[in-house]
C-alpha cells in the first residue's frame, strides 16, 4: 500500500490566515477566535491522518510476520507464481545409469522433473533410484492385494498372493532401511538389504508365473518385471559407488569375477590376525527362559514356539536366550520378523532335536513354508542342536531350516534332510562347525552365507524313483543380479558322504555322480576355499542346471582344496581357479562383514 500524503490545504508550504504579518489580532476578536478554532481543527485532522498511517504500516507488518508467503509481494500485492520444477539433469543421470544393467529404463525412471535435484551428487541420484523402486513396490503390493481379493476359491492363487504380500512387506522394510543406510554411509549394509529387497520381489514374480491363468495376474507379472529391473538399477549404482566413490565417470555396469571384477578386500584369510577364529557364537550368555519336553520346575515352557512367542517384540539389541533341554520336539517353529536377537541353545547335536516333515508333496504347501524352523528376525543365533525334516527324498522339496535373518550365527548345529535341507534364503549368515546333510540342492538360496569348518555330507536317498544311483548337487545358489552381494563361501570344510551313502557309492561309483553345485539362477556364485573334497566328488566338479543356462554369468571358484575330489584338471571350463591375490574377498570379515557383528565376546 502506498503511503498517504498530507492534504495540500494544510501542507507546510500553504498559506494560512496567520501567515501574514499585516493581519493584526486586535482588529476583530471574532475572527481571531475563528482562526484559533481553524488551527485546532487542522491539528486534529493532521493527528488523525498520522495515526491512520502508523496503523496501516503496523498492520501490514503484522500480516507479513504471520504469513511468510506474503513477505515479498509484487507491486500489485499479488503472490508470485510457483517456480516450475527444474528440468532433470540428464547428463548426470545418464552417467549414473550407464552403471546399470538397464540404462535406458533407468534414465526414463529418473527423468521426471523434480525426481533428481539440479547438479546432483552421486548419492542423491542413488536416493532417487531407491525412491522410484520404493514407489513402484507400493504399487505392486496393491496389485497383489487385488489378486488376493479376486481369488476366493482358487487355492493356489490365494497361497501365492498371500506369500507375495508377506515377502513384499519384508522387501518394503529392507528398502526403507537401505535408504537410511545410504544416508549414513553404511554402504555394505545398504547393499545387503537392497539385495534382499530385490530377492523378495523376484520371488513374488516367480510365484506369480505358476498361477498366470488370468489377465490380472499376467499384467501384474509384467509390472513386477519392471520393478525388479528398477531395484536392480538402484543396487547397481550402490555397487559402483562402493567400488569407485563419487567418480561417476568411473562407474561400470555390474560384472562378475570372471569378467575381472573383484571387490576390495580387508584382512586376509591367512594373515595371522586371528580374525577368523575370534568370530562365531558369543560366550557367556545367560538363558532368559528354558524349554523342557516333559516340563519341570525349572522349565517355563514345553514347546520351542511358546518360548519364541514370549520374546519381546521391541527392536532390542539385547539377546533373548532360550535354553532348549534335551528331547525331541515335534513342532514347526517360526521366529517372526519382529523378534530380534533370539538365541537357541541346546544340549548338543542329536540331543536337542527339532523335527518336522512338511513338504511340497502336500496340497498347497510351498518350499518356503515347508521349513521345520523358519527365521525372519535379525540377529538370530543357535548352538548345540539338531533341526531336521524327515520327509523322504520322493517328497521333493522339504526344508529343515530356512533363514532370512541378517547378522545370523549358527555354531555346532546339525541340519538333516534330503532335498533342500538348508534354505539360506537371504541376507548375511555365518555357519561355523556345523553338520549339514542332504542330497539334492541341499544348501540353497540367495543369501550371503559363509560356512566355516563345517562337515557337508551327501546322504542316501532311499528313493523308489532312483534305484541304482543318481546325481546329487550340494549347492544351488540363487543370485539373480550381478550387483547382489550374495553367494556361498565354504572355508576349511569337509565334503564327504554319510557312512551309509559311501557304501552305496563304493559299490557303484559310476552310478553316483556328486557335484559341488549347479546354477539355480543366472548369476549363481559359490566358492570352496581350503576344503577337503573326498572321492565322491565328480572330476568335472560342477553340474549344469539346464543346458547352457547361466554358464556364462555364474561364478564357481576353487582355491587350494585338497583330497581326491579336488583335482581340477578335468573341471568344467565354466568353473574357475580363484587367483591368490583375490581370495581374501571371501573371508568372513570381507564377504559378510562378520567382524562387525559376530564377535565371540557377548
UniProtKB/Swiss-Prot annotation:
Region Pectinesterase inhibitor 64, annotated ranges: 87-237
Binding site for substrate: 367, 397, 518, 520
Record's keyword annotation contains Ligase: no
Keywords in alphabetical order: Aspartyl esterase, Disulfide bond, Glycoprotein, Hydrolase, Membrane, Transmembrane, Transmembrane helix
Membrane topology term: Single-pass membrane protein
Main location per the UniProt record: membrane
Pectinesterase 64: annotated span: 288-595
Biased composition (Pro residues): 81-90
Glycan-modified residues: 98, 156, 212, 229, 315, 492, 496
Cystine bridges: 434-454
Spans annotated as Disordered: 62-91
Compartment list: Membrane
A GO term from the CC aspect: membrane
Annotated EC: 3.1.1.11
Membrane-crossing segments per the record: 36-56
A biological-process GO annotation: cell wall modification
Active site as annotated: 420 (proton donor), 441 (nucleophile)
UniProt site positions, description: Transition state stabilizer: 419
Tissue expression per record: Expressed in siliques.
Protein origin, superkingdom: Eukaryota
Substrates-to-products reaction catalysed: [(1->4)-alpha-D-galacturonosyl methyl ester](n) + n H2O = [(1->4)-alpha-D-galacturonosyl](n) + n methanol + n H(+)
Recorded GO MF terms: enzyme inhibitor activity; pectinesterase activity
Pathway recorded for this protein: Glycan metabolism; pectin degradation; 2-dehydro-3-deoxy-D-gluconate from pectin: step 1/5
Note: The PMEI region may act as an autoinhibitory domain and prevent untimely PME activity during transport.
Family according to the record: In the N-terminal section; belongs to the PMEI family. In the C-terminal section; belongs to the pectinesterase family.
Protein name: Probable pectinesterase/pectinesterase inhibitor 64
Gene from which the chain derives: PME64
Amino acid at each position: 500500500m502506498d503511503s498517504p500524503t498530507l492534504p495540500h490545504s494544510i501542507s507546510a508550504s500553504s498559506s494560512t490566515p496567520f501567515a501574514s504579518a499585516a493581519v493584526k489580532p486586535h482588529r476583530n476578536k471574532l475572527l481571531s477566535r475563528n482562526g484559533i478554532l481553524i488551527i485546532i481543527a487542522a491539528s486534529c485532522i493532521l493527528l488523525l491522518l498520522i495515526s491512520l498511517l502508523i496503523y496501516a504500516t503496523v498492520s501490514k507488518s503484522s500480516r507479513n510476520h504471520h504469513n511468510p508467503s506474503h513477505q515479498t509481494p509484487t507491486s500489485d500485492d499479488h503472490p508470485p507464481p510457483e517456480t516450475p520444477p527444474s528440468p532433470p539433469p540428464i547428463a548426470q543421470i545418464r552417467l549414473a545409469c550407464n552403471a546399470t544393467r538397464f540404462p535406458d529404463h533407468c534414465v526414463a525412471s529418473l527423468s521426471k522433473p523434480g525426481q533428481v535435484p539440479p547438479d546432483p551428487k552421486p548419492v542423491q541420484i542413488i536416493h532417487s533410484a531407491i525412491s522410484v523402486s520404493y514407489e513402484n513396490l507400493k504399487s505392486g503390493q496393491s496389485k497383489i492385494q487385488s489378486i488376493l481379493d479376486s481369488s476366493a476359491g482358487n487355492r493356489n492363487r490365494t497361497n501365492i498372493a498371500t506369500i507375495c504380500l508377506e515377502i513384499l512387506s519384508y522387501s518394503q522394510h529392507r528398502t526403507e532401511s537401505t535408504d537410511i543406510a545410504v544416508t549414513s554411509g553404511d554402504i555394505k549394509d545398504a547393499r545387503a538389504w537392497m539385495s534382499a529387497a530385490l530377492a523378495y520381489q523376484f520371488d513374488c514374480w516367480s510365484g506369480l508365473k505358476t498361477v498366470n491363468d488370468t489377465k490380472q495376474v499376467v499384467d501384474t507379472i509384467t509390472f513386477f518385471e519392471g520393478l525388479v529391473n528398477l531395484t536392480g538399477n538402484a543396487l547397481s549404482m550402490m555397487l559402483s559407488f562402493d567400488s569407485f566413490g563419487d567418480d561417476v565417470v568411473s562407474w561400470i555396469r555390474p560384472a562378475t569375477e570372471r569378467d575381472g571384477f573383484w571387490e576390495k578386500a580387508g584382512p586376509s584369510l591367512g594373515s595371522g590376525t586371528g580374525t577368523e577364529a575370534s568370530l562365531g557364537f558369543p560366550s557367556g550368555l545367560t538363558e532368559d527362559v528354558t524349554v523342557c519336553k516333559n516340563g519341570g520346575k525349572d522349565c517355563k515352557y514345553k514347546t520351542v514356539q511358546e518360548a519364541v512367542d514370549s520374546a519381546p517384540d521391541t527392536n532390542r539389541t539385547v539377546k533373548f536366550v532360550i535354553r532348549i533341554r534335551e528331547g525331541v520336539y515335534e513342532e514347526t517353529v517360526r521366529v517372526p520378523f519382529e523378534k530380534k536377537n533370539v538365541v537357541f541353545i541346546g544340549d548338543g547335536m542329536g540331543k536337542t532335536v527339532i523335527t518336522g516333515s512338511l513338504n511340497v508333496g502336500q496340497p498347497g504347501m510351498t518350499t518356503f513354508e515347508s521349513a521345520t524352523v523358519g527365521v525372519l528376525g535379525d540377529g538370530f543365533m543357535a548352538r548345540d542342536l539338531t533341526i531336521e525334516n524327515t520327509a523322504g527324498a520322493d517328497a521333493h522339496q522339504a526344508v529343515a531350516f530356512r533363514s532370512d535373518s541378517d547378522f545370523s550365527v549358527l555354531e555346532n548345529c546339525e541340519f538333516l534332510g534330503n532335498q533342500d535341507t538348508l534354505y539360506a534364503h537371504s541376507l548375511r549368515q555365518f555357519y561355523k562347525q556345523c553338520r549339514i546333510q542332504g542330497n539334492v540342492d541341499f544348501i540353497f538360496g540367495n543369501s550371503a552365507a559363509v560356512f566355516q569348518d563345517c562337515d557337508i555330507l551327501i546322504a542316501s536317498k532311499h528313493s523308489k524313483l532312483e534305484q541304482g544311483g543318481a546325481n546329487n548337487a550340494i549347492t544351488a545358489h540363487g543370485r539373480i543380479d550381478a550387483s547382489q552381494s550374495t553367494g556361498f563361501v565354504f572355508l576349511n570344510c569337509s565334503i564327504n558322504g554319510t557312512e551309509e551313502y559311501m557304501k552305496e557309492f563304493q559299490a557303484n561309483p559310476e552310478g553316483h555322480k556328486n557335484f559341488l553345485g549347479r546354477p539355480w539362477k543366472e548369476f549363481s556364485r559359490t566358492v570352496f576355499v581350503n576344503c577337503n573334497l573326498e572321492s565322491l566328488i565328480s572330476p568335472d566338479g560342477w553340474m549344469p542346471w539346464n543346458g547352457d543356462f547361466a554358464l556364462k554369468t555364474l561364478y564357481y571358484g576353487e582355491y587350494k582344496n585338497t583330497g581326491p575330489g579336488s583335482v581340477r584338471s578335468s573341471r568344467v571350463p565354466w568353473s574357475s581357479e580363484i587367483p591368490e591375490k583375490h581370495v581374501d574377498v571371501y573371508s568372513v570379515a570381507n564377504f559378510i562383514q562378520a567382524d562387525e557383528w559376530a564377535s565371540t565376546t557377548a
